[in-house]
């Protein structure tokens, strides 16, 4: 079984010590795990269907690239060069020749396949322990074709969790305030992107100032401060539908919103008659 291990050095000194010993730690001792990410195989009919919908020539290879980049940026894995692979993706997914993967020093192997089923994207993937010569995990996902990048992030999460024992973080998004325009007339828009910088899109038009966006920890909702019609108010935005609404009909200015840990309530501040107050959970 593959696990990523960290070796800790414990220095034991006698109680009666008369000299000061200094230990300088100059580098870690954790080497990235060599892992082979085989391109996901795909039949010709599925390839043509996805190319027509997504304008991608080989969606299986594209998903594999997302997984490979995620693993590499984590710093814990060393994805091996695909040019060194000795086994075709469609064969490796059925039964890897572990001696071939051992030759290129791979300790873990990811294989899989992609199919176009009922207008949906179906992805199957497997994680193999090359050293032990056995399967570690096998999962399948079905979703709309446009979610192909997210499938790559989910696969990475599962692999990361299985090999490190820690929760994955790749299937996450970042909400932020984007700025553009000249220095004297900056325009601020609410924006969102994947954790790897892809799928960036604006959620507001920039007609009003937006500040302090906060993600709901349990759903696809965002709360933020907007100066719509020059009146500072806290808003709630559904990322999936684009529907937004004012949070609470309070007089005066509302600001500094934040979700409760369970995502069911919002706490914020409001100012009325020059008196600053804090709301309770609403």
Task: Name these PLM-found stretches.
Residues 4-15:
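Sec-dependent N-terminal signal peptides
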Residues 26-97, 110:
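Short beta-strand->alpha-helix linker/helix-N-cap micro-motif
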Residues 167, 179-189, 225-234, 248-253, ...:
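A flexible loop/linker signature enriched in serine peptidases of the S9 family
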Residues 174, 222-223, 263-267:
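Hydrophobic beta-strand positions that form the internal "hydrophobic ladder"
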Residues 194-209, 237-255, 281-282:
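Multi-bladed beta-propeller domains
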């Amino acid at each position: 079984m593959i696990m990523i291990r960290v070796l800790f050095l414990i220095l034991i000194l006698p109680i009666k010590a008369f000299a000061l010993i200094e230990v300088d730690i100059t580098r870690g001792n954790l080497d990235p795990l060599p892992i082979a990410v085989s391109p996901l195989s795909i039949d010709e009919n599925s390839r043509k269907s996805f190319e027509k919908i997504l304008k991608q020539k080989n969606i299986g290879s594209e998903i594999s690239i997302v997984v490979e980049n995620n693993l590499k940026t984590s710093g814990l894995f060393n994805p091996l060069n695909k040019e060194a692979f000795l086994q075709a993706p469609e064969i490796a997914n059925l039964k890897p020749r572990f001696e071939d993967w051992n030759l290129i020093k791979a300790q873990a192997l990811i294989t899989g396949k992609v199919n176009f089923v009922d207008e949906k994207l179906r992805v199957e993937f497997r994680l193999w322990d090359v050293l032990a010569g056995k399967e570690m995990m096998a999962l399948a996902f079905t979703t709309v074709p446009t979610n192909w990048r997210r499938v790559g992030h989910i696969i990475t999460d599962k692999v990361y969790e299985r090999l490190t024992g820690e929760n994955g973080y790749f299937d996450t998004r970042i909400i932020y305030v984007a700025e553009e325009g000249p220095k004297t007339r900056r325009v601020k828009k609410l924006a969102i992107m994947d954790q790897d910088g892809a799928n960036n899109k604006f959620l507001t038009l920039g007609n009003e100032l937006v500040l302090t966006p906060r993600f709901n920890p349990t759903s696809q909702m965002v709360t933020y401060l907007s100066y719509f019609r020059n009146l500072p108010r806290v808003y709630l935005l559904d990322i999936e539908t684009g529907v937004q609404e004012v949070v609470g009909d309070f007089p005066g200015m509302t600001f500094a919103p934040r979700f409760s840990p369970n995502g069911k309530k919002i706490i914020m501040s409001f100012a009325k008659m020059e008196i600053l107050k804090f709301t309770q959970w609403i």
